[in-house]
Every structure is written in C-alpha cells, then in structure tokens.
C-alpha cells in the first residue's frame, strides 16, 4: 500500500539544474496511524483504517472515543480506509510515514475542488453566449434544453446553472519532485485540487505511463 494523507500547503517553484522553472505544490504528508484492521475472514476484504491530524477530546463523541481507545491511539480528525494485499501486515498503532515514496515517483492526488457556489451555464459548462444586441433577450441563458408541449419538462441530468465545484477530483500521473522526510513535505510537480489547508490523498499512480 503506497498511499498517504496530507494537507495542501500551497504552490511555489523550484529550479532544475539547467535553470528551468518547475511549478510545484507543497503537501505536508503524514504521519498516519493505523486505527482499525479489516480482514477477509471478518469483513470480506483486507483493509486498514488510518487516522490523520490530532483532534481535541471535547470534539470527539462517545462511540469514536471507544473506537480510538480500542486501537490504543490518540484522537484523530480524519479517517480513511485503504485496501491492502494479503501479504501486507499491519498492527494497530503503526505509523505510516512519508518514506514510502521516493523522488521521481508518479502519483495520483485526490482532493475536494474549490467551491464556486452557484454559477450560470456559461461558466459551469463553457456554453457560448447569445447575441448581445439587435433585440436579443437571450444573452447568457442556457438556451433550448427540452422539447415543447411534450414532455413539457427538462429531463434530469441536462446541463444548466447550479452548484459548481466542491467535488471529489482525482489528478493522475503527477511526478514527485522531492521528498523531505525531516519536515514531512512532498513537492509534487503541477497543481492539485483543493484549497490551502485542504486534506488530500496521495497514492501510487494507477495508470502510470
């Protein structure tokens, strides 16, 4: 299992040996703690649940206090589950650190994209606008999206205005430029989804070229 949770710090740039500029996203990744182990015999599949970022006791409800107490770990703010292979062995309380990755690895980054609120069809779906003059009354509307008297409604799923952003987004095949184990920092080439401070999942690329 080569996956880790991290917090997006922001973007910066570094320079290659030839002087070219490389835009990178800085992610503070790990360490994660194993809070639960699932087995094929009991749950039907092999997986581990991990916790990330400390959480104050007053914000933890009673069921979760029992869950963390059973694992013998401190309270965590974020929990995620990762499937593991049959030959991988983990124990409750094990730490998963950044050293599972190396410089040059290709990864996928999963995060929640920035929320844009309610947007019109032009911004949300890249529609073309209508004429701006000559008596036109349809400047930025979505246009015809259904038939007339029948079915007399718009079918579900048609593109139009509405909520934009705040979706789970996966960016594939990004290259790790540098791994800083001392400061738990990942420098990944390019942009990753989400706001500064947002939690992202960095995993080994599934469709690496």
UniProtKB/Swiss-Prot annotation:
The keyword rRNA-binding applies. GO terms for cellular component: cytosolic large ribosomal subunit. One of its GO terms (molecular function) is rRNA binding. InterPro entries: Ribosomal_uL3, Ribosomal_uL3_bac/org-type, Ribosomal_uL3_CS, Transl_B-barrel_sf. Keywords: Ribonucleoprotein, Ribosomal protein, RNA-binding, rRNA-binding. Residues 127-147 are annotated as: Disordered. Coiled coil: none annotated. It comes from the Bacteria. The keyword Cytoplasm does not apply. GO terms for biological process: translation. Part of the 50S ribosomal subunit. Forms a cluster with proteins L14 and L19. One of the primary rRNA binding proteins, it binds directly near the 3'-end of the 23S rRNA, where it nucleates assembly of the 50S subunit. PANTHER family: 50S RIBOSOMAL PROTEIN L3, LARGE RIBOSOMAL SUBUNIT PROTEIN UL3C. This is Large ribosomal subunit protein uL3. The gene is rplC.
